[in-house]
């Protein structure tokens, strides 16, 4: 057994009772190792073997589609593999076919601009095939890790000041994002909770304490990785009990709660790991230990045993 495995023992996994037929997997900090955008050989093998075994493998990430599919290009996934992106706002197949999308109300987005201005970086993502599909204001003021993000995404970014001018009622808007230091995003979250628009959008937090970086995704009301996974399962006729979700951060929390089997990565923060027992999550190996592969291998084995028993 992997040294970091706690609740995700053979007995703990078998206690899920139902074979897994749909698994949603986060990318950063889960499928991907730290400081790398390359899926490990063992994880690649497990993904393909899961698909071959009849398990629907879905990727569920805060990244947008344009920054998700290229990282999976060499893995060999099926063209119809669902990619849940923008923290649940958009689901497309790996080949790009739209499966599901929920848009953010531009009026709400414009209202949030005034609430967040002056605290970190504000970004809005548009649903359009051509670049630029990101809108930012005051790029020159962006520093540190966020400046590196801006530089790597520069061809996709339109700089508009004030940013509200890019958010007309005719705009197809996917999500907003606020990003900055941990303290800045604590302040941003405080403002959002007390603003006039509270209750008309979702605010989903992702935190990277080691980098003093936090991201608040501003999504349409009711949208999350959880909602996207639930809609996908319903569309495929797969019961909740037959689903698994694997993740490592706060934006995975609701998805882990909803899935029949929620698996928290061993590299998650201590605060999240402490929640696992009361939330009923399994705690698996870390991303550097190919935790995704470990759990997929268990799911494949359990499914094979269940199908074998059914044939007897």
Where are these predicted regions, by residue range?
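The start of beta-strands in P-loop NTPase/AAA+ ATPase cores
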Residues: 21-23, 81-82, 212
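Mg2+-dependent phosphoryl-transfer enzymes with acidic/Ser/Thr/Gly-rich catalytic loops
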Residues: 13-22, 40, 215-312
């Amino acid at each position: 057994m992997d040294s970091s495995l706690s609740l995700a023992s053979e007995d703990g996994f078998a206690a899920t009772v139902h074979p897994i037929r749909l698994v949603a997997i986060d990318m950063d900090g889960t499928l991907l190792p730290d400081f790398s955008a390359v899926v490990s050989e063992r994880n690649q093998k497990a993904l393909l073997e899961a698909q071959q075994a009849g398990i629907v493998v879905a990727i569920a990430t805060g990244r947008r589609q344009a920054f998700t599919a290229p990282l999976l290009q060499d893995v060999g996934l099926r063209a119809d593999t669902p990619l849940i992106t923008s923290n649940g706002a958009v689901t497309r197949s790996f080949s790009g076919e739209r499966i599901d999308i929920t848009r953010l109300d531009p009026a709400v987005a414009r209202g949030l601009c005034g609430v967040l201005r002056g605290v970190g970086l504000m970004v809005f993502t548009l649903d359009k095939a051509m670049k630029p599909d990101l809108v930012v204001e005051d790029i020159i003021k962006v520093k540190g890790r966020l400046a590196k993000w801006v530089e790597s995404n520069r061809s996709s970014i339109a700089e508009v000041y004030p940013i509200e001018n890019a958010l007309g009622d005719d705009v197809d808007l996917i999500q907003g994002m606020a990003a900055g230091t941990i303290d800045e995003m604590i302040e941003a979250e405080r403002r959002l909770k007390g603003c006039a628009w509270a209750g008309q959008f979702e605010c989903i937090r992702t935190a990277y304490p080691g980098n003093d970086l936090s991201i608040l995704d501003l999504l349409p009301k009711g949208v999350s990785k959880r909602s996207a996974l639930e809609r996908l399962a319903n569309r495929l006729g797969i019961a909740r009990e037959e689903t698994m979700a694997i993740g490592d951060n706060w934006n995975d929390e609701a998805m882990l709660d909803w899935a029949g089997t929620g698996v928290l990565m061993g590299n998650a923060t201590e605060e999240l790991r402490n929640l696992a027992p009361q939330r009923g999550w399994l705690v698996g190996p870390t991303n550097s230990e190919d935790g995704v592969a470990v759990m997929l291998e268990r799911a494949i084995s359990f499914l094979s045993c269940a199908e074998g028993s059914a044939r007897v």
